[in-house]
Curated annotation (Swiss-Prot):
<keyword id="KW-0233">DNA recombination</keyword>
<keyword id="KW-0963">Cytoplasm</keyword>
<feature type="binding site">
    <location>
        <position position="7"/>
    </location>
    <ligand>
        <name>Mg(2+) 1</name>
    </ligand>
</feature>
<dbReference type="GO" id="GO:0005737">
    <property type="term" value="C:cytoplasm"/>
</dbReference>
<feature type="active site">
    <location>
        <position position="66"/>
    </location>
</feature>
<keyword id="KW-0460">Magnesium</keyword>
<feature type="binding site">
    <location>
        <position position="139"/>
    </location>
    <ligand>
        <name>Mg(2+) 1</name>
    </ligand>
</feature>
<dbReference type="GO" id="GO:0006310">
    <property type="term" value="P:DNA recombination"/>
</dbReference>
<dbReference type="GO" id="GO:0000287">
    <property type="term" value="F:magnesium ion binding"/>
</dbReference>
<keyword id="KW-0227">DNA damage</keyword>
<dbReference type="InterPro" id="IPR012337">
    <property type="entry name" value="RNaseH-like_sf"/>
</dbReference>
<feature type="binding site">
    <location>
        <position position="66"/>
    </location>
    <ligand>
        <name>Mg(2+) 2</name>
    </ligand>
</feature>
<keyword id="KW-0378">Hydrolase</keyword>
<feature type="active site">
    <location>
        <position position="139"/>
    </location>
</feature>
<keyword id="KW-0238">DNA-binding</keyword>
<dbReference type="GO" id="GO:0006281">
    <property type="term" value="P:DNA repair"/>
</dbReference>
<comment type="function">
    <text>The RuvA-RuvB-RuvC complex processes Holliday junction (HJ) DNA during genetic recombination and DNA repair. Endonuclease that resolves HJ intermediates. Cleaves cruciform DNA by making single-stranded nicks across the HJ at symmetrical positions within the homologous arms, yielding a 5'-phosphate and a 3'-hydroxyl group; requires a central core of homology in the junction. The consensus cleavage sequence is 5'-(A/T)TT(C/G)-3'. Cleavage occurs on the 3'-side of the TT dinucleotide at the point of strand exchange.</text>
</comment>
Amino acid sequence: MRILGIDPGSRKCGYAIISHASNKLSLITAGFINITTTRLQEQILDLIEALDCLLDRYEVNEVAIEDIFFGYNPKSVIKLAQFRGALSLKILERIGNFSEYTPLQVKKALTGNGKAAKEQVAFMVKRLLNITSEIKPLDISDAIAVAITHAQRLKLH
């Protein structure tokens, strides 16, 4: 089974595809979609086109998205919600369903502490997947963490 994890952002959208087979997790690919255009409509189109390319290239069975954290300023939250809505619609069209996890759920699933720092989450991602190189930016390790959280949830059900 292949799981796509997404950490939506207003400038960078982290993504990761992991394989979950025989209780073993492995990283297939990870990166980020760099949102460089200035008009919102173009940003949404760029994001959706990049997601389409990922879904075309990899046979994804499940998708998990990190929920929006409301600590940002209201304008950023609204923009992020628009990106998330566009992502959600595309995923529903292509895959049919997706799961959502709060940052607290992801941190707790990986570190046992819902208030863990992003660096602690990145450390656990590397440890769980036997990754020796640095994962930068943290949007990528967050996306991997979302995918791992979903894999753990699937294992429990």
